[in-house]
Amino acid sequence: MKEKPIFPLLLSMSLPMVISMAVNSLYNIVDSYFVAKISEDAMTALSLVFPIQNFINAVAIGFGVGINAMIAQYLGAGRRDKADEALTQGMVLAVIHGIVMMILCIIGIPYFLRLFTTDANVIALGVRYATIVFSFSVILSVNLTFEKMNQAIGNMKITMISLLIGCVLNIILDPMIIFGIGPFPELGIAGAALATGFGQCVPIVIYIAAYLKRPKRVAFRREYLHLTREVTKRLYSIGVPAILNMALTSVLTTALNAILAAFSQTYVLVLGIYYKLQTFLYMPANGIIQGMRPLIGYNYGAGEHKRVEQLYRLTLLLNICIMTAGMILCLTIPGKLMGAFAENPQTIQNGVIALHIICFGFILSAVSVTACGALEGLGKGIPSLLISLSRYVVLIIPLALIFSRFFGAAGVWHAFCVTETLSAVFAVIIYRRSVKAESFIEAE
C-alpha cells in the first residue's frame, strides 16, 4: 500500500467498491421503481421512512469507518495486535448498536411518520415497511463491520462479491415478493422490505466463509472481547463524527420534508425521489472514497505523508469528473429520471425543475465529500464533522427556510446550490488547516 504507484493502487482499491456500490445503488433504484408501481402512497411512505433508515445505516457505516481507520493505521505501523483488538471490540460494539437501533426505531417510527402526514394509509404503509427493515439492523451492523475490515486490509474483491450477490438477490426477489410472482404471495410494500432483509443476510455468509478460509492479516481474538477504555474511546473518537456525518443527511431530509410539506405532499415525494437518484449519482464517488480511506490511513500510519496528499488530490480529480457526468445527466434527461418513480405529470414536472436547479452544485460537492473522506482516513473525525455540519445543517436548513419564503418550494432547491458553493470553500480551509501540522502539503 505504500510502494505501488498511486493511480493504479487507488483504482485497484476503488474499482471493486465502485462496481459493488453502483449495483447497490441500482438495487435502491429498482426497489423504489417497484414500490412506485404499488401506489404513490407507497412511494411517499418510503420517502418518509428514508431518514430513519438512513440513520440506522449511518450508525453502522460511521462506526465501521472508525474500525477501518484504526485497523489500517495499526497495520501501517506494524501493530498487528492492536489491529486485532480494534476489530474484536469494534464487532462487539457494532452488535450492541444494531440491537439498540432496532428496538428504538421500531418503537418510534409511528410517531415519526405522524409528524409529516395525517394520511392513515401512508402511515400504515410506512410502519409496515419500516418494522420489517429495521428488524435486520443487527445483521446490517455485522455486515458493515466485516466490510470495513476487508477494506482496511485491501481485500476489496470479497467486499465486491458479497455486495454484488446480496444486491442481485434483492433485485430478483423484489418483484417476486411485491407482486406475488411464482411461489411467493403478493406482499406489496412488505415484500420490498423482506427482499432488502434477505439480501443483507447473504453477504454475512460469504464474509464468514472467506474469513475462515483465507490467511488472516487481522483476526477476531477471544482475549480482546472485554471492552477496554483505550480502544473504545479511540473507536468512538473516529466513529461518532463519521456517524454524525452520515446521520446529518437524516436531519436534513427531515427538516426539508417539514418545509416542503407546508406547500404540498408532492414536493415531499419529489425530494424523496431526488435522494434516490442522488444515491445512484454519488455512489461512484463514494466508492472511490472507500478505496482512498484505508490507503490514506495505512500511509499515514507508515509516515508516508507525501503519498497521503497525492491520494487526496487524485481522488478529488476523479470525483469532480464523476459529478460533472451527474450534472450532465440531470440537465439532459431529467424527465426520464423522474418518470422512473412517478406517473403523475405534475410530480414529474416539479421534479424536473428540482433537478435542473440542484445539479449545478454537484461539481463543488466533490470538494466537500473528498475532504471529509480523507480526514476520516486520517482519524481526524472532528474536522470532517465540521464540514458535514456546514453542508447538512448550518447552511442549507436556514437557507431553505429563507429562500422558500420568497421563492416557494423552488427556494429549497436553490438552497442546495448555494450551500455546496459555500461548503466547498469551507472544506478547503478546514482540510488544509487540519493537515498543515502534519506537513502533508508541501511548501510551494
Describe every region a protein language model picked out.
Residues 12-31, 132, 166, 199-203, ...:
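Transmembrane helical elements of multi-pass membrane transporters/channels
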Residues 43-103, 140-159, 257, 270-328, ...:
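Small-residue-rich hydrophobic transmembrane alpha-helices
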Residues 64, 68, 133-151, 159-167, ...:
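Short runs within selected transmembrane alpha-helices of multi-pass transporters and secretion channels
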Residues 22, 26-44, 113-120, 176-187, ...:
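Helix-terminus/linker motif at the lipid-water interface of multi-pass membrane proteins
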Residues 55-58, 170-175, 204-208, 280-283, ...:
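Hydrophobic transmembrane alpha-helices of multi-pass small-molecule transporters
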